[in-house]
Amino acid sequence: MKYKSNIKVSIIVAIYNSDKFLEKLILSIIGQTYKNIEVILVDDGSPDNSGAICDKYAVIDSRIKVLHKPNGGCCDARNKGLELVTGEFLTIIDGDDWLEPDYIEYLLRVVLQTDSDMAMSLNIFTTRERIQVKFDKIETWTSEDAAIAI
């Protein structure tokens, strides 16, 4: 995807009490095969060590921005993150998720190849006992399709 590397993808992560999962998530983001990303970590008033973990990685990787805010809920955290976005495309990740190494590259390629404005990826939910696949394909939409669906 080097020919499209000028397209910046913004990643918003809403974080609340996610310190057990956060390093795995951040490492999966900064290890993406597609490098032109900005990462907006929104610490939603976590009383655990989440904020400190975010700050640690912001020092390590200049693509990471951290916003600390009082707890207002997931939607509020995402909305505050949206105020900082500078990318052409956006993905929103939860603080207890992680990404496959080619997540951004693959979805960006699908969007560009299909002339879509939005893509939804495969979601895999795991517990200690099992792995459950919720969606088994990539779905894409134009802006008009998405507006109609809402």
Predicted regions and their residues:
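Nucleotide-sugar donor-binding/catalytic module of glycosyltransferases
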Residues: 1-150
